[in-house]
Amino acid sequence: MQISLKWIKELIDIENVDLDDLIEKLTLGGFEVEEILELEINNEKQIALEISSTANRSDSLSIQGISVEIASLFNKQPKVCKYFNSSLNWQQKIKNLTTIRTSKTECLMFTAVILEGLEDLTVPKWIQNKLVSSGIMPLNNLVDFQNYILLETGYPFAFYDLDKVYSKVRTPTFSLSIEKAENGSEFFASNQINYKLDNSIFLVQANNIPISIAGIIENDEIICHSKTSSLLIEGSIFSASKIRQQSRKLAIRTDRSARYEKSLKSTYLIEALYRLISLLRISNPSLVYKFHSSNKVLEKVLKPIVLNYKTIVEILGPIKKRTNEHLIYISPETVTDYLKRLNFKFLFDSSTLNWEVTIPSIRSDDITREIDLIEEVGRLHGFNNFLTMLPQIKSVGRADFSYQTRKKITSYLLNMGLTELIHYSLVSNETFLKNEIKLVNPLLSDCSTLRVSLLPSLLMTIQENLKQGNSILEGFEYGHVFSGNIETTLTEIEYVGGIFGGTKIKSSWFEKGQSLKWFEAKGKIEKLFQQLNLGIHWRINSQTYTKKFLHPYRSAEIFLSSGKNIGVFGQLHPLLANKLGLSSEIYLFELNLELIQQSLQQNKLTIYSQYSVYPKIVKDLSFIIKKNIKFDELEKIIYANGTEFLSQINLLDDYKGEFIPEKHTSLCLQLTFQSNKKTLENKEIDRIVKNLKRVLELKVQAILRE
């Protein structure tokens, strides 16, 4: 909004106020000065300011409104315009008018006035000058009066040619109403465009003849022209949301609709109407006005807001600091003065230091809570006049269990050499997985579905990194994955996924690089769960969604000791690796973070065992068994028969090849024996191993190898 300082000075005495001081006060008060304009009007130099206000301060979008704000900031008394007092006797007249039919929620006030005896439509020169100083080119017709009132008071008025209205209704009298348009009806507007309407659009009608789309634009057949001698003036307050909805639907925005969209109050509508008629009477002293009809919906009674001095001090802080570290805060007397400046009615309780403040209706949209009143006090005092101090922390926050779990996992993965990555939860439908959770109205085709796994995004990142000529990237990610139906049973679970391997590792410069093997990669995942103190076991992968990107024979599901499936681990499928141009010796994992957290919370008691000071005895055990026998089963049998001295079992080798029968495999196990009470003897351990061999022969038909 462009405002002329000369016009402002007519309403407030700011002759002695420095321009820089004015700009600083306005900016700190929430009205940013975007540009300073130097104008020359009738050989007189003037200064204008381009000001923007926040969305909730629609009351300041006029010369009168911004003048009241400047008066509050500089503790000046604004001049009361004569027409404010002169229009008071209109209030009773309007109450006795014909009530029009209208929507209580969409039209908050409606007043119509008839003017007759318009002979001279010339616009006074001083009005034209003020329009120019506000960035509006005068047209020297009725539109200038509309624009001037909009600038001065903030209220938009609609003008209709009364003679044309009479010719349309074909009766000497007519009634006004606000009705919904009929579906399929048409409206030819003053901008020469024909609009097709439906029943969501409201129309202002005279005897059921549409004369305007409510709050937006007039009917082309009843607009004013240079020979208009009588007027029907509409002054109304419409719901901001309704006007916004209609404007968007019809793809039309006018000065009227733009003003309604920012919300208006009916507080000074009658005064603005009186001012408009007074301006028209300057060139038409014999002008006759008659009230036609009116309707006002009673506004809600606003409850007082209690403002507490202690809260003001806590929020805004001190204004000064003495040398003895004593802090000085804004005084209750100063707060009272600021409330008076803002024209807020209040009752002050000196015993409790509370103000019971009644907000004027024109500020009811932006001041609804105590914190809003505190902001007003801060604005008038100047936020830059408060000391910048950090608040005292009463209690130190604790890291919750979720954070602690993440920290443990992240620490291990970072130590593995992995980098934390972040991807969008919205992905393209063209991934390795069939994403059936589609968005109804996606912004981009690449972000049209919700991801059902973290792994496709990780693979695409590795591929893109290699395309840029970089080395293989090993990384992990925390993120939510989705399942179910987006309309009914959509579930969202947090997972941690990762990708590693694919590079040749050298122990020294002259040796040939070695790729990460399956058991080494699997061992890294087992080590993670050892760090978390969680027992797991492995099962053959039966997850259908992983078959497209995990190796059919080198992938497995991970289960907790409780039997809950918490994720999957495997090597990249060779076909997909070839398609993406990646190494097939890349490994992926995806773990249910929520289940891991639940399991860790259940492990509340940590049991520590004494470290043995006695030596260990290690024995190797080799045998051939059928392929379908799981290692878990063997482990249970050996631990059950290895006595209390058996402390650890390690799988050293799994061999399939020459001299091994079909559908069989050769295993080599390393058994570690140790006692907490004595030094074990070899003959003692030999008896245990001999018994283990016998048990394995009986239970799993193991063929022992010497």
Swiss-Prot record:
A single GO BP: phenylalanyl-tRNA aminoacylation
Residues where Mg(2+) binds: D366, D372, E375, E376
Cofactor: Mg(2+)
Enzyme class: ligase
Plastid as UniProt keyword: yes
GO molecular function, one term: ATP binding
Domain B5 residue range list: 300-388
Domain FDX-ACB, chain residue ranges per copy: 612-705
GO cellular component, one term: chloroplast
Protein family: Belongs to the phenylalanyl-tRNA synthetase beta subunit family. Type 1 subfamily.
Name of the protein in its database record: Phenylalanine--tRNA ligase beta subunit, chloroplastic
UniProt organism field: Phaeodactylum tricornutum (strain CCAP 1055/1)
